[in-house]
Swiss-Prot record:
This is Nocturnin. It comes from Rattus norvegicus. Interacts with PPARG. It is found in: Cytoplasm; Nucleus; Cytoplasm, Perinuclear region; Mitochondrion. GO terms for cellular component: cytoplasm; mitochondrion; nucleus; P-body; perinuclear region of cytoplasm. The gene is Noct. Its EC number is 3.1.3.108. It catalyses: NADP(+) + H2O = phosphate + NAD(+); NADPH + H2O = phosphate + NADH. Residues 1-72 form a transit peptide. Its cofactor is Mg(2+). It is an enzyme of class 3 (hydrolase).
Length: 428
């Protein structure tokens, strides 16, 4: 039976929060933070928030051995298989008949009701990086974010200073949506997405986004009891601004073996200017001791992108959680690639050459971890960064670090505005 978008999204919200009907009556409510400096006027499509997904439960991790043995076991089982073959049920497109716009005001009120006991969202400002105002078209806003898989946050990541209540999905998903809506990205690149089909795809599609999801073949989320399926990478773009020309799902290889890490690369055409570019999202292998493995994965991704962009003829933006500090080989491969890539967040440093001190900050049982692992790379000769969202300060993050009641992930979102450089034929 057909359900209106309003009724359907309300049902998704209420399914996760059986007590929400009581919170929707008049009472104290958490208000959304005012627009951040540099944000754009909200369009009707980007004024909504909503939620929906599986009920949050205590998670039990299945004994699967250590990370090394588990990965090699997975590799041995999947050398001749693909992620799509492993999880075809997670690659089915939603019924387009139901993809109608959300009523923004009512759904935003529902999200506010869910979050009414939470402290306000962190405030972050955009830094103006323009050197001129020559572009005749609006910039392209790109958001990169590892949103923290729900199964991992509750089951495996052991955030010892984060209250269990702060990880409840019925509230955390609303914080994630609030962050996305606050910055209104034209393109959204996400990692650790394990609620694509029941939350992000149905809601973002009603905001005008077209989405693609590529799960990890052997996601660690599947080891957690009551999981919501595998996590993976997701890429969304606004259909009002871009036309999809080509889309490629990439299962990364290392040392000739297919690995558990993936990427999505899409060639888009700007409807305003007719200019084309490639946007890619990835999530490389985590943990200390896997530096050479990440390096091999990065080289494989660069080779794939070289082919897709026809040897840098098509401008490129690469977003990802690389799980690698700037001192690692995989970072150096991207910085020295023939694709002429630059890291956007270096531009926030005084000399324009240094990465931020951190993009993730957490406390686990093994100790406190503060690292720079997330990046937005771009074709320096074809594109310019006109602004970038500043990072949270240590004082804002607080002594218990991330995630928290204020912020839904252990990784900070990165947001940049890009403009095409003029005279592309000469620059390329």
């Amino acid at each position: 039976m057909y359900q209106s978008p309003r009724r359907l999204c309300s049902a998704l919200l209420l399914r996760d929060a059986p007590g929400l009907r009581r919170t929707l009556v008049p009472g104290p409510r958490r208000t959304l933070a005012p627009p951040v400096l540099g944000s754009r006027p909200a369009s009707p499509q980007l004024q909504a928030a909503a939620s929906g997904a599986a009920r949050s439960r205590p998670r039990t991790v299945s004994p699967m051995g250590n990370g090394t043995s588990r990965l090699y076991s997975a590799l041995a089982k999947t050398i001749n298989s693909s992620a799509a073959a492993q999880h075809p049920e997670y690659l089915v497109s939603a019924d387009p008949e139901h993809l109608e716009p959300i009523d923004p005001k009512e759904l935003l009120e529902e999200c506010r009701a869910v979050l009414h006991t939470r402290p306000p969202r962190y405030q972050r400002d955009f830094v103006d990086l323009r050197t001129d105002c020559s572009s005749s078209h609006p910039p392209i806003r790109v958001m990169q974010w590892n949103i923290l898989a729900q199964a991992l946050g509750e089951g495996k990541d052991n955030f010892v200073q984060c209250p269990v209540e702060a990880l409840k999905w019925e509230e955390r998903k609303c914080l994630i949506l609030e962050e996305i809506l606050a910055y209104q990205p034209d393109i959204l690149c996400l990692q650790e997405v394990d609620h694509y089909f029941d939350t992000f795809q149905p809601l973002l599609s009603r905001l005008g986004y077209q989405g693609t999801f590529f799960p990890k073949p052997w996601s660690p989320c599947l080891d957690v009891e009551h999981n919501n399926g595998p996590d993976g990478c997701a890429l969304f773009f606004l259909q009002s601004r871009f036309k999809l020309i080509n889309s490629t799902n990439i299962r990364l290889t290392a040392m000739t073996l297919k690995t558990n890490q993936v990427a999505i690369a899409q060639t888009l055409e700007c409807k305003e200017s007719g200019r084309q570019f490639c946007i890619a999202v990835t999530h490389l292998k985590a943990r200390t001791g896997w530096e050479r493995f990440r390096s091999a994965q990065g080289c494989d991704l660069l080779q794939n992108l070289q082919n897709i962009t026809e040897g840098a003829k098509i401008p490129l933006i690469v977003c990802g959680d690389f799980n690698a500090e700037p001192t690692e080989e995989v970072y150096k491969h991207f910085a020295s690639s023939s694709l002429n890539l630059n890291s956007a967040y270096k531009l926030l440093s005084p000399d324009g050459q240094s990465e931020p001190p951190y993009t993730t900050w957490k406390i686990r049982t093994s100790g406190e971890c503060r690292h720079t692992l997330d990046y937005i790379w771009y074709s320096r000769h074809a594109l310019s960064v006109t602004s970038a969202l500043d990072l949270l300060t240590e004082e804002q993050i607080g002594p218990n670090r991330l995630p928290s009641f204020h912020y839904p992930s252990d990784h900070l979102s990165l947001v940049c505005d890009f403009s095409f450089n003029e005279e592309p034929d000469e620059l390329l």
